[in-house]
Design a protein with these regions (language model features):
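Long, compositionally biased, intrinsically disordered segments
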Residues: 1-17, 27-31, 103-150, 167-220, ...
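A short, solvent-exposed loop/turn motif at the edges and junctions
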Residues: 9, 62-64, 83-112, 118-120
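Structural motif
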Residues: 32-55, 237, 413-418
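Structural beta-strand segments of beta-rich domains
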Residues: 38-42, 153, 228-230, 404-410
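Short, acidic Ser/Thr/Gly-rich low-complexity loop/linker segments typical of extracellular
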Residues: 53-57, 61-83
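Surface-exposed beta-strand/loop patches in extracellular or lumenal glycoproteins
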Residues: 223-241
Length: 509
């Protein structure tokens, strides 16, 4: 709907059609729950793995049923009205797709853009396993391949293992057989958008996988729990040192966060003797036995199975999982030593003020017949209409095509030397629910002139002064850091010395 041009535009009035329309786009909102003083609008987009828009995704705010829900339309975009001033978790669900969550710091009386989300279907390769088997059973997922190389998740279910799914009401239901799938999130360029939840800031984007059981997904179970740890494997496609720890975490959708789990280990298959794999778990390129294997819980039955699955020379990550859900195997990461934030380096050198300039800015002049608004750069005039109580008013900011009030110069770098490791400079401007993004090559004394057309995200002209938020970012290629041996659970813990550059595709946080 069009906006009233005679008054300044406020977000509460501009967006009430979303949840008060007939019918409303956002349905199930408790009457009166949206407060004009704290209102905010979350905007986002949902896509399929191939980048096409995904319609019909149910979008809610986790643990806030009073805000109702909305469905993504044909273009995959959505708007959701909430009360801001806090952290909120956006929950995405669609039948046949793995669910996703994203946490946002939502302001008052403003729009906030959620990162794009990619929702994927479960792996088509399924293994049906009976839990009363007397031998170790194996599931191997579909082999995936991208610029980092091929890999496939493998799970080895020990004999005598029992399992039960934990339902949303807290009850458990035993399972006698399992239709197991392993679905990797971290494949291809849009891997970060596919993640089940936001990674912690210090955790590198490396490898994440959903271990699932069909019956549990159909029942909406929180997880599937096992009576003993399940060894999981994936090729060492990034090249971490043999013998090093593999930080692991699982995603708890009830808490909407990653939970640190026990570290795994990078191992190497050296060969096989008598049908049993010779395995190096310490990094000395020698077959380990006894205590070294006992410390990580590797049994003879597991080594017999490894001998049938992997050739000599294969390096693997091995992680024990006690339950099925989304798991993340990731090292800590960060930028190189010379890196800095945009607010810490490369900022403009302060310039001295002219001697005749006062600290206070010019005041607006609003005398009758002569209106000069210096701060907003507006010229105005008013003329009495004879015989009426009204006046004819003119304001230069209302003239079609005027851009002076819609422009601002944004300084991206100063005169000081920039870091050698700086890859690019990023600029974001948010105004009227719209997000404008630009990327620049590193350069000194860089200034960009931003021009706004005065319209909001729905294509309507806004009236009155509107808040704009500007963010400047310095982007670097991150590098992995080795974990400390003293950490039993290294997930989301800062590391020590650098190992090498991290995977492309971005990081968490």
């Amino acid at each position: 709907p069009a906006l009233d041009s005679t008054v300044a535009t406020y977000i509460a009035e501009a967006t009430k059609f979303l949840y008060m329309g007939n019918p409303p786009i956002q349905f199930g909102v408790v009457p009166g729950v949206i407060k004009p003083e704290t209102i905010a609008v979350i905007r986002g987009k949902v896509e399929a793995k191939d980048g096409s828009p995904l319609a019909g995704v149910a979008i809610r705010i986790y643990d806030h049923p009073e805000f109702g829900a909305t469905l993504s339309p044909e273009d995959g975009g959505f708007d959701m009205v909430v009360n801001g001033g806090t952290l909120l978790t956006v929950d995405y669900q669609k039948a046949g797709r793995l669910p996703a969550q994203r946490q946002l710091d939502v302001p008052w009386r403003d729009y906030v853009t959620a990162p794009d989300v990619t929702m994927i279907a479960v792996d088509t390769k399924v293994s049906t396993l009976a839990l009363d088997a007397s031998v170790m059973q194996v599931h191997q997922g579909t082999t995936v391949n991208d610029e980092d190389g091929p890999r496939a998740a493998a799970l080895l279910i020990p004999a005598g293992t029992s399992a039960a799914m934990k339902l949303p009401d807290g009850s458990t239901q035993p399972l006698s057989s399992l239709n197991i799938r392993s679905t990797e999130f971290t494949v291809g360029d849009n891997g970060p958008e596919t993640m089940p939840g936001d990674l912690p800031a210090a955790t590198g984007f490396t490898y994440a996988v959903e271990y699932s059981v069909d019956a549990a997904l159909a029942a909406g179970a929180d997880k599937v729990e096992f009576s003993q740890p399940i060894p999981t494997y994936v090729e060492n496609f990034v090249g971490f040192p043999v013998g090093s720890q593999v930080p692991a975490g699982s995603y708890d959708r009830k808490q909407a966060r990653w939970v640190p789990e026990a570290n795994g280990r990078v191992i190497k298959i050296l060969g096989a003797t008598g049908g049993v794999a010779d395995v190096d778990v310490t990094g000395d390129d020698l077959a380990d036995t006894g205590t070294a294997l006992d410390e990580i819980g590797m049994t003879t039955a597991e080594r017999e199975t490894l001998a049938t699955l992997y050739a000599a020379g294969t390096e693997l990550w091995r992680v024990l999982v006690g339950h099925f859900s989304a798991w993340d195997y990731n090292y800590p990461y960060g930028p190189k030593d010379d890196a800095c934030r945009a607010s810490q380096c490369g900022q403009p050198t302060p310039r001295p003020r002219p001697k005749d300039r006062k600290n206070k800015g010019p005041k607006d002049c609003n005398e009758k017949g002569s209106i000069i608004e210096c701060q907003s750069q507006v010229l105005g005039e008013e003329i009495d209409l004879a015989g009426t109580p009204m006046r004819l008013a003119y304001r230069s900011n209302r003239v079609p095509g005027r851009h002076a009030a819609y422009e601002m110069d944004i300084r991206l770098s100063g005169l000081d030397p920039l870091p050698q490791s700086l890859e690019s400079i990023l600029l974001e401007v948010r105004i009227g629910g719209r997000l404008f993004q630009q990327t620049f090559a590193p350069a000194n004394d860089l200034v960009e002139t931003f021009v706004w057309d005065g319209k909001d995200v729905y294509g309507r002209t806004l009236f009155g002064a509107q808040p704009a938020k500007v963010r400047i970012g310095y982007a670097y290629t991150p590098q992995y850091y080795a974990t400390k041996d003293s950490f039993e659970a290294s997930f989301n813990r800062f590391g020590s010395a650098p190992i090498f550059f991290a995977r492309s595709g971005g990081g968490g946080g």
